[in-house]
Each structure stands twice: as C-alpha cells, then as structure tokens.
C-alpha cells in the first residue's frame, strides 16, 4: 500500500528525506499552501515538526490557525495528524487543534513510559526509553496520555472521526516503523 505524507514547513528539511527513506511519499506543504483555499492534495498523514510555534524558527502558527477547520476535517475524514513540540512557552500554541492542549517548553532528556499504546509506543523504539530528548510536556490536554515521563504527558493520542491525532514533545525523529505504520494507517484523504 502506498501512502503520502504532507510535511508542513517553509522549506525542505532533513525530516522530508527521512520520511521518504521510510517508504512514505512526502510532499512539502508550505504555510502559504496550507492556508490557501485552492491548494488540494490527497494525503494519508500530515506532519507538523518541532518548532512550529516559535517565530524564531518559522511563520507556521498563523497558517495552522487559518487552516484549523480544514485540518480538523482532514482528520475527521480519515487522515492522520502528527504534531511535535511548539518549542516556545505559549499558552495558545496548540489552539488550532480540535481539542485543548497545554504545552510547557522545557528541553532535556527524560525517561518515557509508552507501554499504554503499542502503535504510539513504537514512535521511540529506536531510542533508549530511559533517556529520550524531549522539548517539553503537556500538563493539560483532552487526549489519552500514551507516553509519560515523571513530569507529565509526552505523547497524546486522540481519535477524531475516522482519523487520529498524535501530539508529542519527543525531540527526535520517530522510528521508521512508527512513521510507516502511522502514515499508512490513515486513509488517503483530500486536504
């Protein structure tokens, strides 16, 4: 089964190539494309990388807010969404998601327990769970905590309609197994 991921950022990154190396076709979706009503693509998964909320790294947050209903509809119709850490202490960094999430930016390695969800747990299977770089925690959210540190949630899962949203503050590339499984489990959905 072939699958297509949309990688949302201003320019190509190493992450794009990593996604392709995992056997997933990857399309760069710039902030202008994301917010443009005429942009259409068929995707299984949309990936929002670390730093999306920090204006020192990109100008993505306004486009995510402008596209929030479109993103929600994409997930409701069967697409999957993978969101990483905002990389800034902003109470409203995740206000574009269809459920409340509060993020506390704090970079350092953490011990993570991902035993509650086999799919989400595979995100870190290439790393030592005793020492994984994270850029924060999610002290409050309306999802299921699928990965926790002693300080709070690191991985959140939420099913919306036929799709799934995973929010994580893990500051590493997801495992190849996770990326292939998560992207291909989403339905090919118009975005």
Segments (PLM) and residue ranges:
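Short, flexible loop segments at the rims of nucleotide/cofactor-binding pockets, characterized by
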Residues: 23-27, 57-61, 143-147
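A glycine-rich, often tryptophan-bearing local segment used as a flexible ligand/cofactor-contacting loop or short
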Residues: 53-133, 178
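Alpha-helical scaffolding within the catalytic cores
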Residues: 31-35, 66, 150-154
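Structural motif
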Residues: 44-54, 82-83, 165-169
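A glycine-centered loop/beta-turn motif at secondary-structure junctions
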Residues: 2-3, 21-22, 80, 139-191
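Aromatic-Pro/Gly-enriched surface loop or interdomain linker
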Residues: 1-45
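A structural signal for short, well-ordered beta-strand segments and their strand-loop junctions
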Residues: 27-30, 76, 82-85, 167-168
């Amino acid at each position: 089964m072939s699958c297509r991921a949309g990688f949302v950022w201003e320019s190509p990154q190493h992450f794009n190539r990593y996604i392709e190396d995992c056997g997933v076709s990857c399309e760069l979706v710039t902030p202008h494309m994301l917010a443009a009503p005429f942009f259409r693509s068929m995707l299984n998964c949309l990936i929002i990388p670390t730093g999306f909320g920090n204006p020192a790294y990109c100008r993505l947050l306004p486009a995510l807010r402008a596209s929030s209903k479109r993103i929600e509809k994409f997930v409701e119709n069967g697409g999957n969404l993978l969101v990483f850490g905002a990389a800034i202490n902003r109470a409203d960094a995740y206000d574009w998601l269809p459920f409340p999430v509060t993020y506390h930016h704090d970079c350092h390695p953490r011990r993570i327990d991902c035993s509650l969800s086999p799919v989400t747990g595979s995100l870190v299977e290439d790393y030592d769970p005793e020492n994984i770089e994270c850029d924060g925690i999610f002290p409050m959210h309306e999802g299921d905590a699928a990965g926790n540190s002693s300080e709070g949630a690191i991985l959140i899962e939420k099913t919306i309609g036929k799709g799934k949203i995973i929010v994580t503050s893990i500051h590493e590339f997801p495992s190849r197994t996770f990326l292939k499984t998560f992207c291909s489990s989403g339905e090919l959905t118009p975005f």
